[in-house]
């Protein structure tokens, strides 16, 4: 399906709406196809119900992706245009200097009209008119010098084998002609007996390139079989220089020469400064050399003569570890439980109270009474009196019995069962 990419596609969906666009992409994994520059044509009477018909639209969508399962019909209206073949390149031959992909027509080049004479340009450099249609390659501006025919020859004229290869140079301006008056004389002497070339300005090499200086003793080339065209010989030569622009050109050349002289002086100063710096560096380096501190290995570090014995070192380490563990086991473990300072060893009991002295028991009861008062708000159970012994001590026994009744009332208030009160002996 990739060969249909770029074709104009007419697509009808299951909604009976037709779309026309250019096939952009086909995704077989997602079962989708994409169209670009899509136009919506509507249902076009496929609904068979005027109320459900969808009219077309003039809007063009840039990109639409369609699901393949929802496509009802697909038709190719215009196939994809085949791309133009790439231009044929010449072989990689060092003998080829330049090439042109177009076919050269010699007959058309011979009948081509010569370029119009150069019009004076008020801004200095002469400008050129566009060459006629079908003109050869060298008639265009900025053409390489090797494609330019010798001056005075008609365009497209074949050269004889005896014609020497004479490079073509543009007409120099007046100032260059004034500076080199021997140029015209040498050329006329060197090419005596040959038809003079009518040099046309504006073609060939730029004006800032200096022509070669022919020596007077240079042998003249042989005669050529090609003569200059009469129409070109009758054409008056033009130098392309405006008379009124001569002072401005001389002033600009004077400024350029001044700037060149200034730059030359500056370059001389820079060269002298560079020489002075190099001489000063030479003088400094010729003096006594300073020692540069370098990092050298310590000679006192002795290198081991034998390899390290890992087995012996591991045994030694294991013995040291065993000694340390044995010393820790020999030490007395820290005592965390101290009976004299522990809370549970100070709990009062009857056997402990009996073993105490009377003063110790009294102090213990006072402390317990104060703790009870602070904790419960009641001092304690009071004195545990005993019954009086004998009749003579009956009053004391009854008094003790009254204290016993108070103790029972205290226990009843705290939720305990009252004890049976023994009868007082009368």
Curated annotation (Swiss-Prot):
Residues 1-80 form the Sm domain. GO terms for biological process: negative regulation of cytoplasmic translational initiation; P-body assembly; stress granule assembly. Residues 84-93 have a biased composition (Pro residues). Residues 350-371 have a biased composition (Basic and acidic residues). GO terms for molecular function: mRNA binding; mRNA phosphatase activator activity; translation repressor activity. Residues 384-401 have a biased composition (Basic residues). GO terms for cellular component: cytoplasm; P-body. Residues 261-278 have a biased composition (Low complexity). Residues 226-237, 279-298, 405-426 have a biased composition (Polar residues). Keywords: Cell cycle. Residues 296-332 form the DFDF domain. Residues 79-100, 204-305, 348-426 are annotated as: Disordered. A motif (TFG box) lies at residues 360-380. A motif (FFD box) lies at residues 335-351. InterPro entries: DFDF, FDF_dom, FFD_box, Lsm14-like_N, LSM_dom_sf, Sm, TFG_box. Required for G2/M phase checkpoint control. This is Protein sum2. It comes from Schizosaccharomyces pombe (strain 972 / ATCC 24843). The lineage of its organism: Eukaryota, Fungi, Dikarya, Ascomycota, Taphrinomycotina.
